[in-house]
Amino acid sequence: MAKQDVIEMEGTVVESLPNAMFRVELDNSFNILAHISGKIRRNYIKILPGDRVKVELTPYDLTKGRITYRLRK
């Protein structure tokens, strides 16, 4: 998947699920299921419910995404 094929959006983590999965509510009020990117996992960045995050979505499946950045409060 090329970098220009992704859709970047911001949202809020609603719920933490097993296996490093999170339910994220996007700014347009859609709920998606997102997992953590490798760089966040490698740098031990904690993501908790209530955190603002940047999410990448593919145009093929808009219900799943990848958390790429945790925004500052």
Curated annotation (Swiss-Prot):
Where is this protein found? Cytoplasm
Q: Which GO terms describe its cellular component?
A: cytosol
Q: Which Pfam families match?
A: eIF-1a
Q: Does the entry feature the keyword rRNA-binding, yes or no? A: yes
Name the source's superkingdom. Answer: Bacteria
Molecular-function GO terms, alphabetical: ribosome binding; rRNA binding; translation initiation factor activity
The family database entries (InterPro entries) matched by this protein are listed as: NA-bd_OB-fold, RNA-binding_domain_S1_IF1, S1_domain, TIF_IF1
Q: Which SUPFAM superfamilies match?
A: Nucleic acid-binding proteins
Asked if the Swiss-Prot or TrEMBL record annotates the protein with the keyword Transmembrane helix, the reply is: no
Under Gene3D superfamilies, the record lists: Nucleic acid-binding proteins
Give the UniProt keywords, A-Z: Cytoplasm, Initiation factor, Protein biosynthesis, RNA-binding, rRNA-binding
PROSITE patterns to which the protein is assigned, alphabetical: S1_IF1_TYPE
- Primary location: cytoplasm
Per UniProt, residues of the S1-like domain are 1-72
What the protein does comes down to: One of the essential components for the initiation of protein synthesis. Stabilizes the binding of IF-2 and IF-3 on the 30S subunit to which N-formylmethionyl-tRNA(fMet) subsequently binds. Helps modulate mRNA selection, yielding the 30S pre-initiation complex (PIC). Upon addition of the 50S ribosomal subunit IF-1, IF-2 and IF-3 are released leaving the mature 70S translation initiation complex.
Its family remark reads: Belongs to the IF-1 family.
What assembly does the database describe for this protein?
A: Component of the 30S ribosomal translation pre-initiation complex which assembles on the 30S ribosome in the order IF-2 and IF-3, IF-1 and N-formylmethionyl-tRNA(fMet); mRNA recruitment can occur at any time during PIC assembly.
What is the name of the protein in this document? Translation initiation factor IF-1
Q: What is the lineage of its organism?
A: Bacteria, Bacillati, Cyanobacteriota, Cyanophyceae, Gloeobacterales
